[in-house]
Design a protein with these regions (language model features):
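One-carbon transfer enzymes
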Residues: 2-199
Length: 199
């Protein structure tokens, strides 16, 4: 919704900390997503495509993939896109779809862990360290090969909202642009579940 990870990517491209990269299109399933506004402000094409507008999930999946193919993208970046990615898209874009998750996978991830629920889970368990993970997307939920992780300390008195903000500022907004830059410059290879990063 808010598009803060998108803004971090836009800033990274403008400041040249992300190189060899341009944003072809921003797609949201939520017509009210501020990410669409952010994209338009920077002259980036913004598209809303929602499963609710289709008679079946299969029809949505087919159109979504067709529209994505039309942009001829090399990399698909998910940031708060809560629609299940069609399996045919995962197969076609194998190790070319990345997602950011606001915990250190394999903790507090998988079905049901999204948004504030992740940080509520971390605080309820009493962990001292949490963070964020950028990973390739596979057929599972948060199960794909891990590209980058960054740890963030949990502090006394944290609320889910405070912790969410700290994880965004200290981890998400740093490692998502970093991962894109590494991939765009051919420094990332995947063997099975393991990502190798060349210097």
């Amino acid at each position: 919704g808010g598009g803060t990870n998108l803004q971090a990517i836009i800033d990274g491209i403008e400041q040249k900390t992300i190189t060899n990269t341009e944003i072809a299109v921003v797609i949201s399933n939520n017509p009210g997503a501020y990410a669409l506004e952010r994209a338009k402000k920077h002259g980036i094409e913004a598209v809303c495509i929602s499963p609710k507008e289709y008679e079946s999930r299969a029809a949505f999946n087919e159109d979504f993939l067709r529209r994505l193919d039309a942009y001829e993208v090399d990399l698909v970046v998910l940031a708060g896109f809560l629609v299940v990615i069609p399996e045919q898209m995962i197969a076609k874009y194998r190790n070319r779809i990345i997602n950011i998750h606001p915990s250190l996978i394999p903790s507090f991830c998988g079905t049901g862990y999204y948004g504030l629920k992740v940080h509520e889970g971390a605080l309820a368990r009493g962990v001292k360290v949490t963070g964020a993970t950028v990973h390739f997307v596979d057929e599972g939920t948060d199960t794909g090969p891990i590209i980058l992780q960054k740890a963030v300390e949990v502090q006394e008195g944290d609320t889910p909202e405070i912790l969410q903000r700290r994880v965004m500022e200290q981890a998400e907004w740093k490692i998502m642009p970093q991962a894109i830059d590494l991939i765009a410059n051919g420094k990332v290879t995947v063997t099975g579940k393991t990502v190798h990063i060349s210097k």
